[in-house]
Amino acid sequence: MGVSRVVTTLPPDPAEKTLPVPELNMEVQAQKGFNVIATANNRDKGVNELSSALMRRFNTVVLPLPATMDEEVEIVDRRVAQLGRALELPAEKPALEEIRRVVTVFRELRDGVTADGKTKLKTPSGTLSTAEAISVMTNGLAMAAYYGDGAMHAGDLAAGLTGAVIKDPVQDRIVWMEYLQTVVKDRNGWKDFYRACHEVI
């Protein structure tokens, strides 16, 4: 549902807890406990700005990104393990090193600088959130389970990672290619990662 559609169908007074359904020529009364939850992020604002009157009807909760690399790696590791069990993926739990590599890529591209602070980087248009890192890792786990040998390798992560970074096919592709060439290619122990991601592009 697009933003403009949400704006036109939300009740003018949320206290009424009634939602009109014009297509059915009726109104639906909310049950006890009903809530509308809207999510957003600071990089993807959509096409239509919400009015300040509408925004005041929501409680705003800001979830900052994890402060440290270790904290983000721990969150991704825990959630990927939970999702792997829930989805009953017959693959080995990903090595912490693979999670650390994905989180490193996300953090460096988000921050616009390498972890050592020596190289400035262009930032892509996407958010590269922790949730996306979890998604990339879970996708890699599924790839390893169903198309690989059950152990996660760089090739299992390459497509998901490239898709997470490249949202704009022109600008983000340039950002990703530059990052691969200037950072990943010469990084110690990342040759397999570089080759796998380069093959996807």
Identify the meaning behind each predicted range.
Residues 13, 105, 157-160:
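Short acidic/histidine-centered micro-motifs embedded in hydrophobic/aromatic stretches
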Residues 1-9, 14-88, 141-143:
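Canonical AAA+ ATPase core
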Residues 145-201:
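C-terminal engagement/docking regions of AAA+ P-loop ATPases
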Residues 4, 8, 100, 131-138, ...:
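Non-catalytic, well-ordered alpha-helical scaffold segments
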Residues 108-116, 130, 134-154, 163-170:
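AAA+ ATPase "lid" subdomain C-terminal helix
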Residues 45-49, 60-125, 146-150, 188-199:
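Conserved C-terminal "switch" segment of AAA+ ATPases
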